[in-house]
Amino acid sequence: MELGCPELLEPPEDIFSTGSFLELGFNGPPSKVPGLQKSESDDFLNLFIDPNMIRCSETSPGSDSGVSEDPGSPAPQAPSSPALYEVVYEAGALQGTQREAGPTFGLISIQIDQWSPAFMVPGACTVSDLPSEAHRHILPRVSTIAPPPPAALLSCQRLFLTDEEKHLLGQEGVTLPSHLPLTKAEERILKKIRRKIRNKQSAQDSRRRKKEYIDGLESRVAACSEQNQKLQRKVQELERQNISLVAQVHQLQKFTAQTSSRAAQTSTCVLILLFSLALIILPSFSPFQSQPEARSEGYQLHGVISRNILTHEDMTESPESPVLKANLEELPQVPATNGSTKMAHLKMRVKARPTGPIRGMVHADEM
């Protein structure tokens, strides 16, 4: 760029307007900028800006915007240069940081009685020839604030140890510092202590689970043994009932055997009686009795000769009575008329009376 560039000679009209301040992240008018009083803000806005004092150039390699990162160190002043204000703004960086850290004024840097060859870079503007009565207010840029290193953060952190870790460290005879960072040896000791604590906790958990499992098994064994005893008592009762039932069955078998034999005997007797009655009754209903004429024609009655020997009651016993008995026993057989021989039946009845007389009767039938 050349110094006589026409667009650089004309100052931008809206550089200090309300819209430009809204772009920079300020919600209020320029009068609300810290470091400027009410009257000073009016003078600042009504200021006549000499276009010849505005120059543009490249930024210095050691700084982002030509402004020193250390706001407290003053720059070398030129003897013939008047007091000036430098207003540096970057809209892109301001919009990114406004959302995170809220409204900030670190993007505006105002320096009094300071002049340095400023060069115009994209996104930066330098305004010179400002009143020297303005209050000097220098704020650092947000982009210049770098995050602290991790070592600095670790140095601010405090080391927290549990009571068990402290106890184990005391047993080991090791004392750890209360703030980080730790040395390699201290880190190894701390890891070793924490590993011991984890192993101890895992062993306690395993023992607790084992104890719970054993307690569960014992409770199950107790329940099973109690149930087994109940079943044994029930089995004994069933055995006694079975024995009593077997005895009753034997008694019933004996009783049924006796009743069956008695029934067989009774039935046998009844059958014999009925058969006898049938033999007695059936001949009277013989079919031959219905023909009396035929029987009378084919069969004729014949007379029977019988002899009776009578004795008197007053007759004494004769001496020939034994001889008579012998003769009667030796009677010969008499042949019958139909050619069949029959024995003569002699019956003698001798009745002895208390008086001594004997009655004898000989009966002979001949057919």
Curated annotation (Swiss-Prot):
CC annotations in GO: endoplasmic reticulum; endoplasmic reticulum membrane; Golgi apparatus; mitochondrion; nuclear membrane; nucleoplasm; nucleus
Annotated region (Required for transcriptional activation), positions in chain: 1-52
Ranges for region Basic motif: 191-230
Residue numbers on the Cytoplasmic membrane side: 1-267
The bZIP domain, residue ranges: 189-252
Gene Ontology molecular-function annotations: DNA binding; DNA-binding transcription activator activity, RNA polymerase II-specific; DNA-binding transcription factor activity, RNA polymerase II-specific; RNA polymerase II cis-regulatory region sequence-specific DNA binding; RNA polymerase II transcription regulatory region sequence-specific DNA binding; sequence-specific double-stranded DNA binding
Domain of life: Eukaryota
One Pfam family it belongs to: bZIP_1
Localization (cell): Endoplasmic reticulum membrane
Membrane topology: Single-pass type II membrane protein
Disordered: region residues: 58-81
Keyword Cell division: no
Glycan-linked positions: N338
Lumenal compartment segments: 289-367
Entry's transmembrane regions: 268-288
Keyword DNA-binding tagged: yes
Post-translational modification: Controlled by regulated intramembrane proteolysis (RIP). Following ER stress a fragment containing the cytoplasmic transcription factor domain is released by proteolysis. The cleavage seems to be performed sequentially by site-1 and site-2 proteases (PS1 and PS2). PS1 cleavage may be suppressed by a determinant in the C-terminal region.
Site residues (Cleavage), renumbered to this chain: L310, T311
GO biological process: positive regulation of transcription by RNA polymerase II; regulation of transcription by RNA polymerase II; response to unfolded protein; spermatogenesis
Subunit field text: Binds DNA as a dimer. Forms a heterodimer with CREM isoform Delta.
Family statement drawn from the similarity comment of this UniProt entry: Belongs to the bZIP family. ATF subfamily.
Protein name: Cyclic AMP-responsive element-binding protein 3-like protein 4
Organism: Rattus norvegicus
